[in-house]
A protein has these predicted regions:
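Pepsin/retropepsin-fold aspartyl endopeptidases
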Residues: 1-275
Length: 275
């Protein structure tokens, strides 16, 4: 899975023997959108990782149990699990943001394409991409790396300023319950349960409508989002300047032609009815 919401590249613990990896123990506990679990990350290195016809070498990876991402779920799921009614290929792991930045990767969420620069991130490539997309009606939204090593963008919920984590590994845009209520967004009754990726933690989720969801200067009216209690560690709730409301997921990234320039730390969006 291509997961901008994961700072590091992860390999499923059940795939370690398949890839012949040697795993070292660490003291770092596994965490996700809904908190931390008892499990501790392992550490390893992949000698050769092929993506299409591009091969990168000596990739450091974290080892964790990702079995929750491979379960068949009939209910809408959130976090780093993409729900689908048809059979999906087994996920051996996720490609994290660290490698995406290092190799100047560009993600086309709508066309489901990943572009890799073997020579690394290039300011010239980012400048050319910016000129090309803004000339075609895309809105440019700068991303920043927050203290948790997640990429986020400025935004607003019903005019209340906040930030959103940019998470291609999340099927849905998910907002913290308390943040939603403070922004004047009503919360419905329990709609189901969602999995928060690494750590396999599960949380009750609701669905609600936001009158105006802003991502930078890009605005969405009457946006439907998932609402759940998100971990304070993820929200950075103790920091007024760095705090966020939750994650901007694939639902609005894919439907608004999102192009993510990881090397240039920029998100581009365009409304479907724009030409």
């Amino acid at each position: 899975m291509i997961d901008t919401g994961s700072p590091n590249t992860l390999v499923d613990r059940n795939s370690v023997n398949t890839f012949g990896l040697t795993v070292e123990k660490t003291d770092s506990t596994v965490g996700g959108l809904f908190g931390r679990s008892w499990e501790r990350f392992g550490a390893s290195k992949i000698k050769s990782l092929a993506m299409g016809n591009c091969v990168v070498t000596n990739v450091p990876v974290a080892i964790t149990d990702l079995s929750g991402m491979n379960e068949d779920r009939s209910a809408a799921a959130t976090g780093s699990h993409i729900a689908d009614h048809k059979a999906l290929s087994y996920l051996n792991g996720v490609l994290g943001a660290r490698e995406m930045v290092k190799f100047g990767m560009i993600i086309d969420c709508t066309r489901q394409m990943l572009y890799i620069n073997p020579n690394g991130a290039s300011s010239a490539v980012s400048q050319n991409l910016a000129s090309f997309l803004t000339g075609r009606g895309f809105t440019r939204i700068p991303m920043q790396l927050n203290p948790n090593h997640h990429f986020d963008v400025e935004g607003a919920l019903n005019g209340h300023g906040t930030r959103f984590l940019v998470d291609t590994g999340s099927a849905n845009t998910l907002i913290d319950t308390q943040v939603a209520v403070k922004s004047g967004t009503g919360v419905t009754a329990l709609a189901g349960y969602g999995a928060g990726g690494a750590g396999n933690l599960v949380e009750g989720v609701n669905r609600t409508g936001v009158k105006e969801l802003a991502i930078g200067n890009f605005k969405l009216a009457n946006a439907e989002v998932v609402v759940a209690h998100v971990s304070g560690d993820v929200l950075l709730s103790k920091s007024t300047e760095e705090s966020n409301a939750g994650v901007l997921g694939q639902d609005y990234l894919a439907t608004n032609f999102a192009v993510i320039d990881m090397g240039g730390k920029t998100l581009y969006l365009r409304h479907p009815d724009s030409r």
